[in-house]
Amino acid sequence: MKKTLFLLLTLVGFSVQASSVLSMKERSVLIDNILEQRFSDVLPHIMEREGIDMWVLMSREYNEDPVLKTMLPSTWISARRHTMLVIYNPGNGQPLERLAVARYAVGSLFKKAWDKEAQPDQWEALKHIIEARNPSKIAINTSDSFALADGMTSTEHDKFMAVLPEALKSRVVSGERLSIGWLETRSDLEMQYYPVLTQIGHSLIATAFSNEVITPNVTTTDDVVWWLRDQTRALGLTNWFHPTVSIQRQDNEVFDQISAFSKRPGENIIRPGDLIHVDFGITYLRLNTDQQQHAYVLKPGEKDAPASLKEALKSGNQLQDILTGNFKVGRTGNTILSMSRQQAIEQGITPAIYTHPLGFHGHAAGPTIGMWDAQEGVPVQGDYPVFAQTAYSIELNAASFIKEWNKEIRIMLEEDAFFDGQTVTYLDGRQTEFHLIHSDKNQ
């Protein structure tokens, strides 16, 4: 009977999550609609902001520029042969011209602009297209500091510069800020669906951190990790990193930040009195989540987590409020980090802040707001400013002394949020109470 009830509860939870997930065909239509909106509404603004009127991107099959890959139609899994894309802004409010200097049109997004029979040399065809438009600046994806903006290979760069006439070579510039702007800026249509993705992630964590999945003194942390992997795949989604589930408990072990962030936790049996932590992220509609929450395993007879643990969670939430309150357009990641740390310390919090942009990638392009091992700031990536219409993984931890355990623990939180230029809003709320797991069999 108990096994039947467990299966029923699991299936009910699964059906609720699955009802939020579109079929592959429905996803395809939506992804292409999102891309069309991004090209019509998002990209023109960014090109004008950065003063660039032509953007040239290229990829060879299975060696994709990470930016170009986000521009491909839903039915294109990768570039084909040698895909060259030209995006030209003619100005005066006219639509962007999107050309594929390739054997194929790139769906309906990029019009085929190379007739191989008339001009067998693809590079020459690209040169003629550029010359005909005579752009003032030609952006290519090269960057010393932002990996996602450095997608043009050395071979492609050499060939590209070799084919350009001298008059155009001086107009070639790094498309670093253009790439970051494209990757970090979220469209209105994307933001209609991003909360759904974060809700699915929260729902999976809530089930994982319940008696539906965890039986104290039996279930291991690795069992929960693989349950999350299996359920993600069962929903037709993917994980962009392998989840971690770790434990802090009343023992003599001291929290070691280097080990916590550089080593995977070992398999551990979950026991009454444990404080459990999960780090979990999924990918859906080409967007990503990155979430961390905590659960407490009630000891027999307990109805709630110890008071000190609940106060520790409040301290973590307070640190979140301090950080998100310091977001301002034009303010750099390093400035936000410094302000937030100073304010937190003044309020009696021991903070560690390592917040990052979120979107097409889990660790996405945009301003880095600290790293766990760089609380003094991050050169270059941390000097990039915050823009409106951007999403972030609000990731941090706060240390607290737990008197019931006579030791210090870390409340490690991570929630996905959106900055509209004025306010940071969590996409599906945030954790303010522990997930509770019962040890008593009759509960």
Predicted regions and their residues:
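Sec-dependent N-terminal signal peptides
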Residues: 6-9
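Active-site neighborhoods and metal-handling regions in enzymes and metal-associated proteins
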Residues: 19-443
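N-terminal signal peptide c-region/cleavage motif recognized by signal peptidases
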Residues: 13-15
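Positively charged n-region of N-terminal signal peptides that target proteins for export
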Residues: 1-4
